[in-house]
Amino acid sequence: CDGRALGANDGSDWANAFTCLQSALAVARPGDEIRGAQGTYRPDRHGEEVPHGARVVASGRRTDTFVLPSGVTLRGGYAGFGAADPDARDIDAYKSVLSGDLAGNDIPPAGNDWQSIHDFVLDNSRADNSQSVLTVSSAGNTSLLEGFTITGGHAGLDSDVEGNGSTASAARDGAGAFIVASSPRFVRCAF
């Protein structure tokens, strides 16, 4: 997946990579591996069932989320399209970010002290952010997320999270990752 790719948007290689991560996740099946190039991905679309499968449409709704399907591996930190070696992988040099900051307007905390972080968490300007950035539901322990930073989620009381046909009550939890009846593996990820 690479938002800079210019090809067929079918995921067959880096030149034809899906430009929308949610499109790649919508067609992923158990055993598939999705590679995420450097960049920021926002869950600003949702899946809709259509006669021959699912399609992903833009919406910008706070309830949209990345849904990691059962048995699917999602790896970040790749150089991606346009690089001399698009398969080069270094999660520190090629940061892949799943961000709930749908409007791209979050301001980072002023410092690492308790008060700065407390003020950041309670900042109402983030109320337009995605309620849950990533959702894993009924996936057992076969799903893997590796090499991503997850940021910008803003869960709200009595909210529902929707994605690829699944709905779960996120309530006040799960701003970064909302996990239901699953035990996915997160490797070298930051929240």
Predicted segment positions?
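Extracellular beta-strand repeat scaffolds in secreted/surface proteins
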Residues: 32-36, 76
